[in-house]
Amino acid sequence: VSESGAAQVRWCLVVPVKKLAMAKSRLAGPRMDAATRARLALAFAGDAVSAALAAGPVVEAVVVTDDPLVGSALGELGATVVPDRPDAGLNPALAFGAEVAREKFGDVGVVAMAADLPALLTSELDFALGAVSGYQRHFIADAQDVGTSMLFAPPGVELDPR
């Protein structure tokens, strides 16, 4: 319950993470080999999940991945790790993670969050979660305004990633 007496929405984040061997492929080149890209992707995901788990209204982070190293590292941070059972791309992984979150926690809000947000601050996520209102989805576009960094579905609203 907030200071105003209103019930605070509880949120569960869903974070899909590719297999590290496929991560950050756009950075491939002579100065960035596969091992370096994998370490970078894992560090990005770890930073993002750590910041998310420290946010006040966040009750859980569900990481959807088939990579055992990702699962181990993010599980050690406190995330729930589930296999990418759909194995059909980003949107099915997000929908599956949202289903897992609501099965475990009931009527929570769900946030689909990109794993590559290493500069995410807990205070920024707290602010964004507090700004979501009503019964509709909200989103935060990526820096290039061509994708989505976060997609918010309040309690009772389907995540419906597209």
Task: Please identify what each model-predicted range represents.
Residues A41-V58:
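A short, N-terminal amphipathic alpha-helix
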Residues V1-A28:
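N-terminal nucleotide-binding beta1-loop-alpha1 segment
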Residues A114-P118:
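The conserved acidic donor/metal-binding loop of glycosyltransferases
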Residues L27-T36:
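Short glycine-enriched, charge-decorated loop/helix-capping segments at active-site entrances
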Residues G56-T80:
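Acidic donor-binding segment of Leloir-type glycosyltransferases
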Residues A73-G109:
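Short phosphate-binding loop-to-helix
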Residues F152-R162:
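Short, glycine-/small-residue-rich phosphate/pyrophosphate-handling segment
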Residues A119-D145:
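Conserved donor-nucleotide/metal-binding helix-loop-beta segment in metal-dependent transferases, i.e.
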